[in-house]
Design a protein with these regions (language model features):
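A short acidic, glycine-rich active-site loop
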Residues: 51-63
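Generic structural signal for helix capping and beta-alpha/helix-loop junctions
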Residues: 41-42, 90, 115
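Small/aliphatic-rich secondary-structure junction motif
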Residues: 2-48
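General small-molecule cofactor/ligand-binding pocket signal
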Residues: 33-35, 81-85, 137-139
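Gly/Ser-rich helix-loop-strand patches that form or flank binding pockets
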Residues: 97-140
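Structural beta-alpha unit
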Residues: 73-106
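Short, hinge-like loop/turn segments at secondary-structure boundaries
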Residues: 49-53, 98-101
Length: 140
């Protein structure tokens, strides 16, 4: 089954990408995988504090996922999958695509300012020399 991979964050672009992925997956018999990434800046503190911050970040991602999962189940009849990774965003996106062969499309929201494709798209394309392992859909 082909999965649409969406990167979770707090931006309006994420919501647009998620909505698009849910509709496309529903219409094509696919699935949606939501990737939450805990950035290195969130847990590079003293050991005890860093662990507490990591746990809080994971809980925050899981709480957001529950909201989006409920919406997706009610609107599109899909149950999305949550994956949580730790590290630099572009690196973790590429690692997830490589580790999950069912990921067929990366869905990202466009930069709302209209000034370039956005930081994650720029990082991914720059790192891969313009060649990504899966097609990318950028949702306006």
């Amino acid at each position: 089954m082909r999965k649409f991979l969406v990167i979770m964050d707090n931006s309006p672009e994420f919501l647009n990408a998620l909505r698009f992925a849910a509709i496309r997956a529903s219409k094509t018999g696919g699935a949606v995988e939501i990737l939450g990434i805990i950035g290195p800046e969130e847990f590079q503190h003293w050991l005890g504090v860093g662990e507490a911050m990591r746990a809080e970040a994971r809980e925050r991602i899981e709480a957001h996922f529950k909201v989006f999962s409920k919406w997706m189940e009610e609107k599109e009849g899909l149950t999305p999958e949550l994956v949580i990774r730790e590290g630099e965003r572009a690196t973790e996106v590429l690692a997830q695509i490589k580790e999950d062969p069912e990921v067929g499309i990366l869905v990202l929201g466009a930069n709302p300012s209209g000034e370039g494709p956005g930081p994650l798209v720029s990082q991914l394309v720059g790192r891969q020399g313009g060649v990504l392992p899966v097609p990318v859909t950028i949702v306006p």
